[in-house]
Amino acid sequence: MNKPVKKQQPKKVIPNFEYARRLNGKKVKIFLRNGEVLDAEVTGVSNYEIMVKVGDRNLLVFKHAIDYIEY
């Protein structure tokens, strides 16, 4: 007997993503895992990256490279 194949449910959005999205447009201080600190403005957030503006440069920072964020 063949069992019916269940369709995979779409992944739910984790609360941390919603929290990070609220930082959009705010000035923050991002502490990276390598010890660097970025004084930046958050311009965009996706599942794995945060887009920030540091001075006149736009940077794409991977979330796994972030230690913590102060705002």
From Swiss-Prot:
<dbReference type="Pfam" id="PF17209">
    <property type="entry name" value="Hfq"/>
</dbReference>
<dbReference type="InterPro" id="IPR005001">
    <property type="entry name" value="Hfq"/>
</dbReference>
<dbReference type="InterPro" id="IPR047575">
    <property type="entry name" value="Sm"/>
</dbReference>
<dbReference type="GO" id="GO:0006355">
    <property type="term" value="P:regulation of DNA-templated transcription"/>
</dbReference>
<dbReference type="GO" id="GO:0003723">
    <property type="term" value="F:RNA binding"/>
</dbReference>
<feature type="domain" description="Sm">
    <location>
        <begin position="15"/>
        <end position="71"/>
    </location>
</feature>
<dbReference type="InterPro" id="IPR010920">
    <property type="entry name" value="LSM_dom_sf"/>
</dbReference>
<protein>
    <recommendedName>
        <fullName>Uncharacterized protein MJ1435</fullName>
    </recommendedName>
</protein>
